């Protein structure tokens, strides 16, 4: 789509011809960005512009903003996530409690570890690696992208032969089974094409794919919001197709991508107990106080939920399912709008839910977040399932990531390229392996 002279936004033909209401969240965000760029402004201000975009969409925005900078235009990005913009940002202004606490270059900011912690910004995983490594290896040079990380780390590690692990045919009890699932919408668009998948009980399962691949359509069948054109969805061996959403939600509950769709009450405290009250689940004042305190919402308990920040609203909708009876929790883009502090709280919560025997199914474009937490992955592409298995199996399938145009997390990519004897999925494990070798 040529939106102005020299500026092109790649939007698929089906997106250009569709009604905005029929697009996925990321596709709608792409269209909004394209419409603003069509005005060709001298100064462009963008507030969390890529929060709903897949890696392809983020790369598109990166490229366009790079072209704008090269042509002398100014862009101001308001965001707590520097992962996508690290390569194009020149200057950083840090604001804490309404005051400017930093005003300087990107490289200065990336060296200021204490300030990064205070602001709770989300950093590129390469910067996290540099920060952790510099504490143990004082002479390491700063890096913030993959090329720099490769160059700096290549001479510091000794490649080892990584033992090829046979894919263990781990048996599991599927809590949800999907059989030959087809979804055709009223306009003829086929959102899901003969999808077969199983969800292992008590695991963290990630649903991956580009915007428009069918991820949200898929999970909306799991809690009955969508009825399939054909196919079957079973919960513990029993079909859910004849049941209402209210009946299904006692066992399988969905937290929407956009929290405004789930906020109904006048206060944060009432919102927290909404699901439990609707399901007739008992709870105590101690339960409420403990959750609000642990997740830093105790000062907000009498406030109107819609007045919270985006990240707090999203966290509140997730917290509201903690008191429900559901043992399968579906999270659609759970990190949307969250800063580093909230994401840290979310990770702990998800791991605690798993420890309690719950099954968590997550849709997310935040690939490092997914690889830190997920045990099992299902990948969709244009409505078809192209992979199902553990993340250990997935990292051996580069062809799958090439097909869906998603990059491996930096720690996984570097584990492979540096010849570590084991592929690791988080920064702490990576640093341990690098310093060991």
Model regions: which residues?
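Conserved ABC ATPase "signature" region
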Residues: 1-14, 283-300
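The feature captures the beta-strand-to-loop junction immediately N-terminal to the Walker
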Residues: 208-210
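Conserved ABC transporter NBD signature motif
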Residues: 231-239, 248
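Helix-to-loop junction immediately C-terminal to a conserved catalytic motif
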Residues: 223
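Conserved ABC ATPase signature
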Residues: 19-23, 27, 304-308
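Conserved ABC ATPase "signature" C-loop
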Residues: 97-98, 382-383
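Catalytic Walker B motif of ABC-type/P-loop ATPase nucleotide-binding domains
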Residues: 44-47, 329-332
């Amino acid at each position: 789509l040529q939106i102005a002279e020299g500026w092109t936004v790649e939007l698929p033909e089906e997106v250009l011809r569709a009604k905005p209401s029929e697009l996925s969240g990321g596709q709608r965000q792409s269209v909004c960005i394209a419409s603003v760029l069509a005005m060709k402004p001298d100064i462009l201000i963008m507030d969390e512009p890529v929060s709903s975009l897949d890696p392809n969409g983020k790369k598109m925005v990166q490229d366009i903003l790079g072209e704008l900078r090269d042509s002398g235009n100014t862009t101001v990005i308001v965001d707590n996530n520097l992962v996508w913009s690290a390569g194009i940002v020149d200057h950083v202004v840090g604001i804490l409690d309404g005051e400017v606490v930093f005003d300087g270059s990107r490289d200065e900011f990336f060296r200021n570890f204490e300030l990064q912690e205070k602001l709770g910004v989300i950093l590129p995983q390469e910067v996290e690696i540099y920060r952790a490594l510099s504490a143990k290896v004082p002479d390491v040079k700063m890096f913030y992208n993959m090329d720099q990380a490769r160059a700096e780390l290549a001479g510091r590690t000794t490649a080892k032969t990584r033992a090829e692990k046979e894919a263990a045919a781990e048996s599991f009890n599927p809590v949800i089974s999907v059989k030959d699932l087809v979804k055709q919408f009223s306009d003829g668009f086929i959102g899901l094409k003969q999808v077969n998948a199983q969800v292992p009980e008590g695991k963290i399962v990630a649903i991956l794919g580009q915007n428009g691949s069918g991820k949200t359509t898929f999970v909306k069948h799991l809690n009955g919001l969508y009825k399939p054109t054909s196919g079957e969805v079973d919960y513990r061996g029993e079909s859910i197709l004849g049941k209402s959403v209210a009946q299904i939600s006692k066992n399988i509950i969905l937290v929407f991508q956009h929290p405004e769709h789930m906020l109904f009450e006048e206060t944060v405290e009432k919102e927290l107990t909404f699901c439990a009250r609707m399901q007739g689940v008992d709870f105590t004042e101690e339960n409420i106080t403990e959750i609000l305190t642990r997740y830093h919402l105790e000062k907000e308990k009498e406030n109107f939920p819609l007045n919270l920040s985006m990240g707090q609203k999203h966290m509140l909708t997730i917290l509201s399912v903690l008191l429900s009876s559901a043992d399968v929790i579906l999270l659609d883009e759970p990190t949307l709008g969250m800063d580093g502090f909230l994401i840290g709280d979310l990770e702990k919560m998800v791991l605690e839910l798993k420890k309690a025997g719950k099954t968590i199914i997550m849709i997310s474009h935040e690939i490092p977040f997914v690889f830190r937490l997920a045990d099992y992955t299902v990948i969709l592409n244009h409505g078809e399932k192209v992979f199902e298995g553990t993340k250990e199996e997935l990292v051996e399938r580069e062809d799958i990531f090439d097909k869906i145009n998603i990059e491996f997390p930096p720690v996984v990519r570097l584990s492979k390229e540096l010849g570590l004897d084991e592929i690791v999925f988080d920064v702490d494990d990576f640093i341990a392996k690098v310093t060991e070798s």
